[in-house]
Regions:
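Glycine-rich, Arg-bearing micro-motifs that act as flexible, cationic patches
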Residues: 111-130, 243-266
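Local beta-strand N-terminus motif with an aromatic residue
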Residues: 1, 105-107, 128, 137, ...
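A short acidic, glycine-rich active-site loop
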Residues: 53-68
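Structural beta-alpha unit
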Residues: 68, 72-109, 210-241, 247-255, ...
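Generic structural signal for helix capping and beta-alpha/helix-loop junctions
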Residues: 42, 94-96, 118, 149, ...
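Small/aliphatic-rich secondary-structure junction motif
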Residues: 1-53, 153-219, 234, 238-240, ...
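Short, ordered loop/turn segments at secondary-structure junctions
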Residues: 37, 114, 144-146, 187, ...
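Short beta-strand elements of ligand-binding domains
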Residues: 111-113, 138-144, 271-275
Length: 277
């Protein structure tokens, strides 16, 4: 997590993401890059206002405004470090951020979620959701003001499949960075019910295979995997959820927006996600 990208539209949620990212970077001598993407408006030529002149004026105004806002953020939230660089780029938000991640060898993206629906928006249709779907590096989604130093309990919903090796190693590194307890979680549902004897055996084998330390093993019964993750996290007062997205198995369909609104809106903690194949 040495090179952290924070896409920034200067909203409160973007500021919270920046503060979280800056704290991480201070802890490992890393760097934060603030990126503001300016959407280019479509303007037709006219006698009164040539398109090129309007576009140049608009882009200059947007860049000047972004530079001023960047300076305020750095002065207020990163006066004592870490290293913060800023970029203003032009184009459609998602492809521009995607290209930036690939070209600049970003290791982590930290994004704010926004809107009254909170994590509902994160899962359905927002820029955050779009970026989570394609991003080749981990993404941490921040809903509210959160101190990185407060992350002490990480919930890892797992299918316990053998093909989760790369994911699990990344989450172990995440746990090590935060010096947190890792709560391995298997959700037992009526549609895919397994006995406690079977589940406990699989959990113990999983922990042994990956040589886990400072962890708990948990089976949680609920009507759906989505509800189970949300309810378990609330019950143990989890500080972060870490999970895969967009895979063909397991919990990938968490991104489909099927979590009941009255459950997901009460999840306040950050979510770490990584796109698997």
């Amino acid at each position: 997590m040495k090179k952290i990208l924070v896409p920034c539209d200067f909203s409160d949620s973007a500021v919270q993401a920046f503060k979280f990212a800056a704290e991480i970077a201070r802890g490992n001598n890393g760097e934060v890059i603030l990126l503001n993407v300016v959407e280019i408006p479509v303007v037709h030529d006219s006698v009164m206002m040539p398109a090129l002149t309007y576009e140049e004026t608009y882009l200059k105004e947007m860049k000047d405004r972004a530079d001023r806002d960047f300076a305020k953020m750095k002065s207020k939230w990163a006066k004592d470090g870490p290293k913060v660089t800023t970029q203003v780029q032009y184009g459609a938000t998602t492809p521009t951020i995607s290209r930036f991640v690939e070209e600049n060898k970003i290791s982590l993206v930290v994004m704010g979620t926004k809107g009254a629906s909170g994590l509902k928006e994160f899962f359905v249709g927002s820029n955050t959701e779009k970026i989570v779907r394609w991003c080749p590096v981990p993404v941490i989604s921040i809903k509210n003001a959160t101190k990185a130093s407060s992350i002490k309990n990480i919930v890892f919903p797992s299918t316990l499949h053998k093909d989760e090796e790369e994911l699990t190693m990344k989450i172990k590194a995440l746990q090590d960075f935060f010096k947190a307890t890792l709560h391995i979680l298997y959700i037992n549902t009526p549609a895919n019910f397994r006995t406690d004897v079977v589940n406990r055996k699989m959990l113990n084998e999983f922990a042994k295979r990956f040589m886990l330390k400072n962890f708990t093993l948990n089976v949680y019964n609920d009507l759906s995997e989505e509800a189970g993750v949300a309810n378990f996290t609330k019950e143990i007062k989890g500080d972060m959820i870490a999970m895969a997205t967009h895979g063909r198995k397991g919990l990938s369909h968490l991104m489909s927006g099927s979590i009941a609104e009255d459950v997901v809106n009460h999840i306040e903690c950050p979510i770490w996600t990584w796109k698997t194949n």
